[in-house]
Amino acid sequence: MKHYHKIAKRCVPLLMGLALAVSGCTKNFESINTDPYGLDELDLKGDFAMYGGPFNQMQLGIHLFTPDWQYQLQTNLNADIFSGYFMTPNPFNANVNNSNYAMVDGWNNYIWTLAFDNVMSPAQAVIDRAKAEGLPNFEAWAIVLKVLTMHRISDVYGPVVYTNYGKINTDGSVTYDSQQEAYAAFFADLDLALEKLKPFAEDATKPKAFTAFDLVYGGDYVKWVKFINSLRLRLAVRIAKADPGKAVAEANKALTNSFGLIEEHAADFIIDSRNISNPLNVISNIWGDIRMGAPVEAFLVGYNDPRLASYFQQGTDDAAPGAFKGIRNGIDMPDKDLYSGFSRIKDLGTKMPLLTAAEVWFLKAEAKLNGWTVPGVNSVQEAYERGIEESLGQWGVGGQFEAYRNSTAKPIPYVDPHNEDNNVAAGSAYLSAVSPKWNDAGSNAEKLEQIITQKWIALFPESVEAWTEFRRTGYPKLFPVVINNSAGVIPNGQFIRRINFPLIEKETNQAGYQGAVQKLGGNDNIGTRLWWDK
């Protein structure tokens, strides 16, 4: 049976016909890859289409823009829910599904397979061809997108196929990296990408070869280098407990690089499809399959947060007309109609933020809290408040920064107007007591809770990162599922730690799968903690 890791044996399904020139998956390469309208290989090289064509697919495949149903399985019915941002009103599979920890293997395969099909496979093809033809800028760009995608996959599953991608063992299997090995490779690849892009960023006369294909920065090399530094800082902070020495070293690389990081929201890493609606719009506002999560209501209504109306719409439920209402995860869901009147997402247009200035400042705040050297930052509070300021600016409500940073408001108790069993009362251990206003007298744990709570609000709607940070830190305080169908894997009152390895791996890469479970260091279930989850 063909396995999708076997890049040398399978064709890469690229979006654009020009991208066939990159994959080279056929014996009839010359004839198939000759444009019948007169664009030969020389033409394609001249405007970089031969190398740039696959990048649309890669960029749109990280947070999958189309088809919508694949995004629903890739992210919406897992990380979107586990992050606390969303909950479905639809009792899928007779209400025995991911939302209450009865994991649906048929859904969860897509997290893995879409990453390899849409990003890893075309990225490796571009890297190989760019290396062969002396185009280090395209090689670097593909490496960066590969790291951005695959760290997310590792953060969902743990061990991952990365350094051995395309390397087939004699028994037909492919070997996984442990998560520690994968992170070491991510950092090494960021080193390589930075080395290759630096000459282009330093020389303004270099042609901006990415311009026609770059859905984020329009081909600006300097901004891509800043993104590399910012991504490195994200990954460094991620491993602070698992490998403190490596974390400090990598953070120092990011924080001292002369090009700097993403520090203003005008430079946010936001993928703009330009003509494809963010699938969350369709899933929420057309299909009616997703609504606001209860923690969003508790925090953002409680804080009178100025971003709330940019994130969600007021509900239409008869029991709470005009209110911003969220659904608690893992509840009894007799039918789709009961909670359909709760808050839908506000239209996100064609954009998806994946790494923002706000996140960078919250990373700096945590680094400073850890006692790391953070150039240009005098205090944890300074970086924390700058994170809030950049997030408010990103969402067009920057004028309310002063009032918000001085707010002592608290999250509100959660009330389900349809079932009081789902309520979270005042004084509950699951209801946070932190305010936006910085508490410099608080303990380090309380300060970390403030940082990550505001970071969680600012990351919206990037649920993979939000869920990852919740698992790593325990913040913000979210509400556990009411109905727990994990068969004891997740103790009541606790939370999912990862997603099982995809069924396709058990079926087509059995030896690799067994090695991955060994490297995971625990059972292949949703209760096993990842390497960085200390």
What is each of the regions a protein language model found here?
Residues M1-T34:
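Bacterial Sec-dependent N-terminal signal peptides
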Residues C25-A79, A125, A132, P476, ...:
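Membrane-proximal, proline-rich intrinsically disordered regions
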Residues K45-F48, T88-L145, T149-Q400, D440-E449, ...:
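Structured, solvent-exposed acidic/aromatic patches
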Residues Q70-Q74, F312-Q314, S463-R472:
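Short coil/turn segments at secondary-structure boundaries
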